[in-house]
């Protein structure tokens, strides 16, 4: 969702609460739980998963390996669920021509730097930079080039914007801020 007027442009950024992240976390949790249950079943010599017929899986080496994969998968799944619940990467970009200020806010991981807040003047912006890399791993990213601070990304690398969409967004933002565009 975006909000624009003549002097203020606010763009909300989606964080880690995407449908694909929910799907991956859920699939990974179920798969790793299955691996762990099969490993524990082989250790105990009982069938803990009643949906499947009992299979003879020796604890050494198959049961140990499956238990290890199950535990590792549960750790990765819990990491994904934590990033989803904390909504890491979400935030907003606010461009205020009236005040002459640009504010970029993102949520991070819990701790000292949970809130990432950047504020700078519009007159310090050199240009809007578009980075286009085509090939197997396409990369289309929009940056703000700031004097003394380098380039700050405005779009995520996994947004999968088409070249037309990224150019349109860059042109609208450059027109709104009255700054030039650079293409790399």
UniProtKB/Swiss-Prot annotation:
Keywords: Chloroplast, Membrane, Photosynthesis, Plastid, Thylakoid, Transmembrane, Transmembrane helix
Regions that span the bilayer: 21-43, 58-80
Main location: plastid
Example of a GO cellular component annotation carried by this entry: chloroplast thylakoid membrane
InterPro entries per UniProt: PSI_Ycf4_assembly (IPR003359)
GO biological process: photosynthesis
Pfam families recorded: Ycf4
Keyword flag Plastid: yes
Membrane topology: Multi-pass membrane protein
Subcellular localization, as worded in the UniProt entry: Plastid, Chloroplast thylakoid membrane
Role, per record: Seems to be required for the assembly of the photosystem I complex.
Family statement: Belongs to the Ycf4 family.
Protein name as annotated: Photosystem I assembly protein Ycf4
Organism in which the protein naturally occurs: Carpobrotus chilensis (Sea fig)
Gene: ycf4
């Amino acid at each position: 969702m975006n909000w624009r007027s003549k002097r203020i442009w606010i763009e909300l950024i989606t964080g880690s609460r995407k449908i694909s992240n929910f799907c991956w976390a859920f699939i990974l949790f179920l798969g790793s739980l299955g691996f762990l249950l099969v490993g524990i079943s082989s250790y105990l010599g009982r069938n803990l998963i009643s949906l499947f017929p009992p299979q003879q899986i020796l604890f050494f080496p198959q049961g140990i390996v499956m238990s290890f994969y199950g535990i590792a998968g549960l750790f990765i799944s819990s990491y994904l669920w934590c990033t989803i619940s904390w909504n890491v990467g979400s935030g907003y970009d606010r461009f205020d021509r009236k005040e002459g200020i640009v504010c970029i806010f993102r949520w991070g991981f819990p701790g000292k730097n949970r809130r990432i807040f950047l504020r700078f003047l519009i007159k310090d912006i050199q240009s809007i930079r578009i980075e286009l890399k085509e090939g197997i791993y396409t990369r289309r990213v929009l940056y703000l080039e700031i004097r003394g601070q380098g380039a700050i990304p405005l779009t995520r690398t996994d947004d999968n914007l088409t070249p037309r969409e990224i150019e349109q967004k860059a042109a609208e933002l450059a027109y709104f801020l009255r700054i030039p565009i650079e293409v790399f």
